[in-house]
């Protein structure tokens, strides 16, 4: 009888652990697809004017085919410039969430590329890499931007949160000479910091 109680308790504890582990894995690692915006922009938003201005920009849709299963999407704002900024969004967001920065850089004379990270927004992919897989995707976007604007272009990469961590990972790669600067806004230094010390 005592063995049955202990065995039942251990089995129940194991099943609970599996259920909790499954929940957190799905939350942390699986795809995030933004639902269409149903509410209007609020005038109380600090970046209201910039976001409103961003909505009025003519955007090109760029697509990168990484392999047979992965297609990455981005919006590109062509400012007919030799300066380009690539803006990297955070976890559970998409490229358009960087609209305030996009308007600012556009007004400063930059072309602006706003990619949706793998498994975010319109981009496909099943799992989120928290910057590790995405760093290679951003290198592909950099090369595509150079191909579009020419070898004499200058590129700035800016990321926020997960995008900031991705930007710092990209900065450690062998990069084309056209990449001139990185801006990192509140990225994390490790996955543990991302989950256990959120901003």
For each predicted feature, which ranges?
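An N-terminal hydrophobic leader/cap segment in hydrolases
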Residues: 4-64
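Alpha/beta-hydrolase fold nucleophile elbow
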Residues: 149-161
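The serine-hydrolase catalytic nucleophile loop
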Residues: 90-104
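Short beta-strand element of the alpha/beta-hydrolase
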Residues: 82-90
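A short loop-to-beta-strand scaffold at the N-terminal edge of the catalytic core in hydrolase folds
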Residues: 61, 67-77
